[in-house]
C-alpha cells in the first residue's frame, strides 16, 4: 500500500517536472521569437519637437483675437521596408518624403483653418484669423486599420499617440493660454484628438473652445473614461467635441473608423435628421441612429476607392474638404463664444 502510494507521488512529481520543463522551453521559444520579430521590425527615430523641422505653422492672427489651433494629420504611409529588409508600420518624421506627404494635407487645412474663408464671413470684418500648429508624428500605417482589430489598432497607434501628446505638451507650454484652444484632426488625427482629450488636465480643458474629430469615431467607452469629451449640441457651445463621418448610405459605415456614439451636422449644426443644403446641390442629413452624415447629390468620385477599405460607399477622404467653409466659420464662432464666457482673457494679445 505504502509502495503504491510512493510510486504515485513519484509519478506526480515527474509529471510536474516535465510540465515545468515544457513551460520553460515554451517561454524561451516565445522570447526568442519575440526578439526576432522585434529585430525584423523597424521603429523610426522619435521626433524632437524643439526642432522647427517637426512642425508646420501658420500665424495669420496679427490682431491677437483669434484661436490657437493644434491640428493632427491623417494616415499617409503604407507599410514600408528599410534598406536592410526590416518592415516598418510607422511614418518616419525624419524622412523628407514622409514629411512631404503629411505636409500636403496640413498646408491645405492650414489655408482655411488659419484664415476664415472670405465667403463664409457674414460681415467681412477680416476676423477669423488664427494661429495654426501641426506636428509631424510617427502615425501608424494604413495596414494597421485594415486589420479590422480594435486591439491591434490600439497597440499599433500607441507610439503615434505618445508623439502627439509630447508635441502638444510643448505647444501648450509655449502658447498664450489666455487664448481659446482648438483641437482638430482627420482620420488617425481624429483618433489623436480623442486621445488628447484624455491626456489634457482640467486647466487645459478649460481653455478648450472645441475639439473637431473629422472622419473618426468617438466610442461610448471614450466618453465613460474621459469627462472632457462632451458631444456638441449646436453651433456655439464650447468645450465640446464635434464628430462626423460621411457616407452615401448607413450600410457603408466602416466600423473601425466610423462606428461612433456621437455626431453633428456641420452644415446646419443640428443633431437631429433635419437636412441641410451644401453648395446648392448637396443634401447632408445626420442619421440620429448611427450618428453619421448621409449625403445625396454628391458622388465623391474625386476620391477613388482604396483597397476596398475606404471610399467604398463611405466618402472618408472628403471630411476635411467638403465642409471646409463650415468648419472655418465655426472655429471663429466657437472661439468668439469662448471669449464671451472668459471676458478677463480678452485684453491679452
How should these model regions be labeled?
Residues 185-189, 193:
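Gly/Ala-rich beta-loop-alpha elbow adjacent to hydrolase catalytic centers
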Residues 65-67, 128-132, 177-180, 206-210:
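Loop/turn elements at helix/coil->beta-strand transitions in domains of secreted/extracellular proteins
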Residues 78, 141, 190, 220, ...:
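Flexible, glycine-rich phosphate/dinucleotide-binding loops
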Residues 31-33, 72-179, 301-318, 324-349:
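Active-site catalytic motif of lipid deacylating hydrolases and related acyltransferases
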Residues 81, 144-146, 192-197, 221-225:
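A short acidic (Asp/Glu
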Amino acid at each position: 500500500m505504502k509502495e503504491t502510494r510512493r510510486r504515485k507521488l513519484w509519478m506526480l512529481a515527474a509529471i510536474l517536472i516535465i510540465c515545468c520543463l515544457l513551460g520553460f522551453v515554451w517561454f524561451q521559444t516565445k522570447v526568442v521569437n519575440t526578439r526576432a520579430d522585434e529585430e525584423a521590425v523597424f521603429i523610426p527615430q522619435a521626433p524632437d519637437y524643439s526642432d522647427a523641422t517637426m512642425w508646420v505653422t501658420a500665424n495669420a492672427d496679427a490682431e491677437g483675437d483669434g484661436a490657437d489651433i493644434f491640428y493632427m494629420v491623417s494616415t499617409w504611409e503604407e507599410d514600408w521596408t528599410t534598406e536592410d529588409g526590416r518592415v516598418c508600420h510607422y511614418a518616419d518624421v525624419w524622412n523628407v518624403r514622409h514629411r512631404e506627404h503629411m505636409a500636403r494635407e496640413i498646408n491645405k487645412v492650414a489655408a482655411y483653418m488659419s484664415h476664415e474663408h472670405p465667403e463664409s464671413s457674414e460681415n467681412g470684418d477680416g476676423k477669423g484669423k488664427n494661429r495654426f500648429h501641426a506636428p509631424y508624428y510617427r502615425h501608424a500605417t494604413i495596414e494597421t486599420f485594415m486589420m479590422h482589430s480594435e486591439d491591434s489598432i490600439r497597440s499599433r497607434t500607441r507610439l503615434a499617440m505618445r508623439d502627439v501628446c509630447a508635441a502638444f505638451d510643448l505647444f501648450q507650454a509655449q502658447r498664450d493660454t489666455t487664448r481659446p484652444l482648438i483641437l482638430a484632426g482627420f482620420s488617425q488625427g481624429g483618433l489623436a484628438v480623442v486621445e488628447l482629450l484624455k491626456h489634457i488636465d482640467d486647466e487645459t480643458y478649460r481653455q478648450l473652445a472645441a475639439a473637431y474629430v473629422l472622419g473618426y469615431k468617438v466610442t461610448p467607452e471614450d466618453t465613460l473614461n474621459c469627462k472632457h469629451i462632451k458631444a456638441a449640441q449646436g453651433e456655439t457651445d464650447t468645450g465640446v467635441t464635434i464628430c462626423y463621418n460621411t457616407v452615401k448610405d448607413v450600410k457603408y459605415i466602416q466600423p473601425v473608423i466610423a462606428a461612433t456614439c456621437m455626431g453633428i451636422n456641420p452644415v446646419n449644426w443640428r443633431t437631429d435628421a433635419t437636412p441641410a443644403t451644401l453648395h446648392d446641390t448637396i443634401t447632408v442629413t445626420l442619421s440620429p441612429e448611427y450618428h453619421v452624415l448621409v449625403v445625396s447629390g454628391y458622388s465623391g468620385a474625386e476620391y477613388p476607392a482604396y483597397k476596398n477599405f475606404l471610399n467604398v460607399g463611405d466618402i472618408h477622404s472628403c471630411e476635411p474638404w467638403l465642409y471646409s467653409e463650415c468648419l472655418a466659420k465655426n472655429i471663429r464662432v466657437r472661439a468668439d463664444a469662448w471669449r464671451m464666457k472668459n471676458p478677463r482673457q480678452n485684453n491679452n494679445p
